[in-house]
């Protein structure tokens, strides 16, 4: 799939665009390994949901963009093996040239494919699946279907978590959330929208997730100390929105 790729810079931030003003990824030039956009940080809440200190060991990222999530996991989780699926080789080239995508075939495997086709033709499982794939108009296409979410579930390990970037202000948002819930037998939770309008949905397979917001805050402090990523504002917003019934994050 050929995409019109634009690279822009303003106030020290480099952004990726697919022929429109829609931001497909961003990198602060002085801190290329950090997560610049709010929704990418919120997707990393998934790292707090399993107590195993080695989690995640196997990660699948569908949609490369500016490689923000890929770079963060690559740098901060050196034991993790990363599979990245991107439909457009031009996006991969842009990520390498402008966004410092690492070249490490031992740990980072790039697949030029549609995410749905890739899942259909592999028997692998992952501890964490991150879905963030849109076209120039913000459409996820086949990556927002019941069949796709069922495939994601089938490819999760017993510790498996899926995090999906949805557009909370889009007309089909509620239908997207319902598709995820149905695919995961109700084991899904949706965060309140970021200021950008992005909403992150989480779903789980295998072992149950049941942890208090207090425990999540403790885990967030440890993550901040280790990686510099501060998820405490995200958890505070989650608490204020009363998203977690009884103060429990359950999947």
Label each region the model flagged.
Residues 1-11, 15, 23-32, 38, ...:
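SAM/dcSAM-binding transferase cores
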Residues 9-11, 16, 33-158, 196:
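The AdoMet/dcAdoMet-binding core of the Class I SAM-like
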Residues 22-25, 134-137, 162:
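A short, flexible beta-alpha/helix-coil linker loop
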Residues 139, 166-170, 243-251:
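Alpha-helical subdomain
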Residues 140, 146-210:
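C-terminal substrate-binding/active-site "lid" region of AdoMet-derived donor-dependent transferases
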């Amino acid at each position: 799939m050929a995409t019109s790729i634009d690279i822009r810079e303003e106030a020290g931030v480099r952004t990726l665009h697919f022929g429109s003003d829609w931001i497909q990824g961003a990198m602060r030039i002085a801190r290329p390994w950090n997560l610049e956009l709010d929704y990418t940080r919120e997707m990393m809440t998934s790292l707090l949901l399993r107590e195993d200190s080695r989690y995640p060991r196997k990660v699948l990222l569908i949609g490369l963009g500016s490689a923000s999530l890929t770079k963060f996991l690559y740098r901060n989780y050196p034991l993790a093996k990363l599979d990245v699926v991107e439909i457009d080789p031009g996006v991969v080239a842009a990520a390498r040239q402008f966004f410092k995508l690492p070249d490490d075939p031992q740990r980072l495997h790039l697949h030029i494919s549609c995410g749905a086709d890739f899942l259909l033709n592999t028997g692998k499982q992952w501890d964490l699946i991150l879905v963030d794939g849109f076209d120039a108009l913000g459409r996820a296409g086949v990556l927002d279907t019941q069949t796709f979410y069922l495939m994601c579930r089938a490819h999760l390990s017993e510790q498996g978590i899926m995090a999906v970037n949805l557009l909370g202000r889009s007309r089909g948002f509620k239908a997207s959330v319902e598709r995820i819930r149905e695919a995961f037998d109700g084991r899904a939770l949706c965060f309140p929208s970021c200021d950008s309008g992005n909403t992150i949905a989480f779903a789980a397979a295998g072992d149950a997730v049941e942890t208090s917001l207090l425990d999540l805050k403790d885990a967030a402090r440890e993550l901040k100390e280790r990686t510099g990523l501060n998820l405490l504002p995200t958890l505070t917003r989650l608490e204020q929105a009363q998203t977690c019934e009884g103060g429990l994050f359950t999947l």
